[in-house]
């Protein structure tokens, strides 16, 4: 039973049934309502009204209110705001009507209004300032002035102005000035945020805020990437993240192109691992390492060992950045010569780029239509950047006519941060070198330069171009003299040092000059191209804002990926370069040779340690006090046989002091494998077992590899330790170990027959071996040898054996034998025929009608892939066929280039199989390769030199050479197949078609040249010997047909043979008499002209020849069609109509023969005639003294 409430509750103090509303103070209720609206709660209309209130009062709304504003739907918001607009219009009409009634009353009311306005002006005087600009009134305001109407008293009455700009801040350097136009009654403002009702004025305000930086453009400058540096460098490049991706791509290509090696690497990796995880890891590591040793794999160690012959008095060194040479010679102390530092000082500033700018003092002058062109007076100031334009004007922005009005905006540009480029002068490069003697050194003093200098065991010196020679005193060890040839290895004209912020980089000159940033020169303060860091925003009726771009430092750092980082303060430390020195050792002497042997016991103070260079350092403690005495130390293979093996790096080690427990460091080089280090004599003898990993053959292989790298890297200063006058009895030994390439290291020197027989023997032994591990090892090694014996494999880079007249690129070989026969085992292939077909199609659409091959190997490549290309074109519905014609004469150049594309054509298996058996039909349009020039496909519409070597692969009978499309346009020949060398008195420039040989006999002169074909590219300077200050008119083989710009390409009495028989086949240039002819030197001889064959059209021999000032024996060309003489040698009294002349002119169209004085049949080698005869003498002095020039230009290590 329930009881109804009510009865008992009547007498309570508070009746729960009749409780009314709580009593709240009215102001508290209002506060609650307003606070809920500020928090974004409440009816939409109230929220919008509150936001409008904040907008009109220039107050900042709360975040919650803004959040509610953003959440309101568009249709709802538009409905309420439209009603607000109607209400505002009603209020405006009411005010206008009220104003007219008040004016009729007159009297004191007008005076009262004027006083009120004056009071407002006085109240605003502390914030607003008045001045003049462009002949009109200028008011300077701040952000507190825009909340109310600004009243300015004028002679015409009060001028009321309204400013509704949203970018008004506090005053600072970032100001903006523009016109507030006068609007007549009843016109609404249009495209203006400031207007007045009486007369136009200018407004100025600052745009700075307390909470954030100035407004800046979102745009950024596009800076082209720098790319990888071409310098051989010891340090990592900046942000070099692209190499990992490129290396993975190269690994993939290597696996595809060398499946045999990849299979063997996978088998070896699988055999090495004991579980599946290890097998996968080992296989991946082997596949990643393998291509590093098949392409671009040659590395440089930072320490070389040089052993001199007995009685040697001097030795040639090549010091590289951060490298160290250890020199050992009989009866001489061992020396360490170390390149400590390469430094360039007094850098000249070239150009400064601004990468962070600021924009201040913006002013805009506007004019109405038909009132003339706007002109901003600040245009006269060079520190301002101005821009003129046109805007829409009319009644809503102060103009009586509608139309385009002129506007002129100026802004002051100033640079906040700049990047400075500096150039290095070769004469300001200095080299700091240290020499250290392997003497008696304790572990405390090892590496302590000051202590070693105090003991006369070390010295430092600086080499500069002005002071290349120095003599160092080494105390009891005598003295050494160094004569150096400073060559930085850095082309200072091609690189700049660029400083960005706190970092400095070595950048390419062309990249630096092409930067799209404002720049200035050292002699000027004006910035050029300032518009690149400024943005003129869209112009309004009378206002145009200008903003600066943000700092471009991040973009510059990103673009500099691949550049070399250097340290720069007042000088720059270089990490690329080398120094060639001759070290004279005749005054060096061993110390302690007369000391007796130590008789007390030695102990190992520390366990012997591996230096990482194949040597071991032993720290010995001597208990005796009978010093000074020599240390009996030796390395032996067995304790039962004390025959010394290995050698001491520290020659004649001794204990220098008589104090007990003195410590001495000794360095020695043990043999590969197991050995014992024995110290002491008799029962006081101690020993330590040592194992040195590696092999003698592997060491020799790595040494040869290192020499080949120096040949490629140093160019005309390539050198060879085995070619310096018999000073060395062994080549320079790089002691860093070579991982990978083990098979070629052990068996690469054998013939393929020996490799095959040995492989078969090992396979047989593996099959018959009982032990599983031995059997697998024999089978794997035998299989590798059989594979090597049946495949030609290669590394990139070419080496020359001058004695055998042999050039080797990888393991493929290119031989120039004694009977002048060229034998090549190379085969050019495109990267993929599918992509090449698409490239051909794209080029044909762009107006390229064909190509000119650079060499005969490229021509053969086009012949080999022609049918496959045509099938691809046909399968993809392209009405185009590739036609390969036989080349005529030399391989000519053409102006256009093929361009790369990522697209490829597709072809099915059926079409591919059909292409092997049948050639496709000829299409209506053709793409012509080589052949004679025709009207349908002239040379000016052909492409040339569009491909370069990407990689070397393998093949059964030939080395495969893979080509890719060049990324840049160049006339240079491909350097991947070029080798240059100087050895003894012979210098050679060679590639797969040229063998140009020069000899030293009193002077260097061209001796002979053999041409497989004649091409039209230019020989690269990076592979040119002695190319300083060479005049092209003296080059016998013209520069335009790949003649090296070298002083080796000269001979006394002869000038450039631009009209030689270069269109002939099988050309051999040498200096001798053509069979059955004689040449005499006489002043009455004819003038220089095109080369003439010694037989006429009918085969009659011309026996008598002459020249004016040539040297004998004469220059001749031997070709398949007969013997020709050089341009200086002319026939004596012969019918001109029967002569066979060369029709070639190897100069390009803009050049003329500098020795020509008449028509082609009467061309003189003497421009001034007989009275001004030119004898053709050439200065052959190399500046290093007679026959030693060969050493100055480097040597070849094959």
From Swiss-Prot:
Residues 392-405 are annotated as: Fusion peptide. It comes from the Viruses. Residues 37-72 are annotated as: Hydrophobic. One of its GO terms (cellular component) is extracellular region. Glycans are attached at residues 142, 448, 924, 1001. Genome polyprotein: Specific enzymatic cleavages in vivo yield mature proteins. Cleavages in the lumen of endoplasmic reticulum are performed by host signal peptidase, whereas cleavages in the cytoplasmic side are performed by serine protease NS3. Signal cleavage at the 2K-4B site requires a prior NS3 protease-mediated cleavage at the 4A-2K site. Residues 2-15 are annotated as: Interaction with host EXOC1. The transmembrane domains of the small envelope protein M and envelope protein E contain an endoplasmic reticulum retention signal. This is Structural polyprotein. It comes from Japanese encephalitis virus (strain SA(v)). The lineage of its organism: Viruses, Riboviria, Orthornavirae, Kitrinoviricota, Flasuviricetes.
